[in-house]
Every structure is written in C-alpha cells, then in structure tokens.
Amino acid sequence: QNANQAAEKIHRAIVASTPGEKRLRVALVPYDPLGDAHGVNFDTRRDTWPTRADKSAVSHVALDSDWEAKFAQTLESLDAVRAYVKNDKLGFKIPYVFEGLPRSYYPDYLIRFDDGRPDLLNLVVEISGEPKEQKEAKVDTATKLWVPAVNAEGRFGRWAFVEITDPWDAETTLAETLGRFKTA
C-alpha cells in the first residue's frame, strides 16, 4: 500500500516537472465526449438553492453543505462567472488512483469564467474541508495530470482547477485565479 502511494506521488511529480509536453492524453467517454448540463433532471430531498437562468442550465443547486450554499451564492453574484453548474448527476469525473486502486473523482462545480480573453476559462472547483490523504490524490491528479492533458488536447478550450478551502472567501480565491490567467 505505501509502495503504491509512493509510486503514484512520484508519477505525478515526474509529469508535473515536464510542463508543455503533450504526453498526457485525455480519456473520453466514447458515447458522450463533451457532456451537457441541459438534460439534468432529478428529484432530491436535499435543500436546494435556486439559480439564475442566465448563469446555470440547471434550475437549482442541490446542497450537500452550508459551504456549497455559500459558494453558489457567490457564483450568482460574480460578473466574471458566465455559467456554472454543480457537478451533481452530470457524470463529469476525473479518473485517479489511490492506494493502488483506480477511482473516480467527481469535483463539486464546473464554471465558465471570463478572464478577459476571447475564450472563456473552464474552471473545475473543489470545495474542501479538512485535509485528507485521498483528497490530496484527487487534487494532485486534477492539477498535475487531468488539466494539462485536457489543455494539451486543445479541443475543449482552456481548463484550470481551483480548490476552495473557505467559501466565505471564495470571491478572493476566484479573483486570484482569474488574475493568474489574465497575465498568462
């Protein structure tokens, strides 16, 4: 188990140390490579937050926590957010390995972000609480493997990943992320 974890960390470090090389490839779902939020329709017993029709193709955010409610409110208020959706029943997942086993990571939100460039920035967002080893593997895979692979593919626009550790400060974190890409 420890050997598998060490090998996974070494692999992510090697890939991260060779930026710009198009070695990573995206694994697409053959029958639905692009995905779509317009067909999302499900019942829930969870609390919900209504979304603005001009911001989200899904009418409500099904809430898993107060943190996600606060984050949805923040997204609704930001002009730079052109569209967003909570990744609930969308099927958007990032494959990763933890303790030697293949797993699927379902990030919390997907955002189309206007960073001042002609093409919108697609932002994968994780709302995180306390640090956990499995979460570290998910975040590492998303930032060091998945984002570089999808950006190298070139057909799906620009992508980035951000982890929100304090939803009450999410606007600042998103502004910092936006600033990074305005200068890139």
Model-derived features with residue positions:
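Intrinsically disordered, low-complexity, repeat-rich regions
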Residues: 1-106, 112-121, 127-184
